[in-house]
Amino acid sequence: MTSTARSQELDYLKGVLILLMIAFHLVYFEHLHPYAKQVVYTFHMPAFLLVSGYLVNVAKTWRQFLITMMWIAVPYAIMESAYTIAASMLPVSDHVDNLTPALLLDKVLLNPLGPYWYLHTMVICGLIAKAAHSLPVGNTLRLLAMVIVMVVVSQSPLTLSLPCAMYYLAGHALRTTGQPFTLFFPSTLLAVLPFAVLAFFPTNLDKATPGGAVMVYLSVCSLLAACRLSGNRLRQLFSFLGRRSLLLYVFSPVFTLSAKVLVPFLAFDPTGFLFLVLSLLLAVCGSLGIGYVLDRLHISPWVFGKNTL
């Protein structure tokens, strides 16, 4: 399979995963489907971290690599600051009492609040991967060094979920072997059946358990099979969203919060799926709209390091 085809499959995978993330950040919908939320939370962010670890390019020079990390850190810092300030004023589950400049810095630098922890984790793990790559040893020892540093960091004041870091490491380890992502994760719908069996037992609904790890693997295989079987237009749509997953990740929380205003008008649907569809449209179109405005105002290079989003 060509690198272009593999890239489209990874973009498709990211597109599906970002929609799942948005869907289960809708408080109304997740409360209606708590078990589905548990199942999705078992695999969607671990799968994202696997892909991120696989795609990180540690062969760049330190200068090039730090620039790449900076353009993840800048939108993260802006939105994490905004989220923390909003959480100090709004009656949300992550409400912050007595916000001070020191507490704000703590949330941005050490202990992220809300949905932006993934970007924080990406920067930390990316820097660890690059530092390990710089060691004058073989790949096995570099990966071992990454494990040690990740364990140490996870025990420090700097928030880093060790299970999440291990999924990033797994993706990076796969990349160092030179094995194609789609060879290690074969696209097969046969993965759906064992996934469903594992999901039936609540003890497996934890990414840090062996059952949870197998569910992550099977979910990726299943989604890659869905990519292969999708029509061209649907595949292009999800790939389009996958290429803009950072934009959607950064701005969608604004719209998942705003979607609450739809609840009274859609309460007649006991499943919440109408609310889900309309909220996803709002979040996706709204986020892409913000990206368009940032492009037109020439702000994108200052926030994302790109002329167009």
State the predicted function of each range:
Residues 1-309:
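Alpha-helical transmembrane segments and their immediate juxtamembrane cytosolic regions
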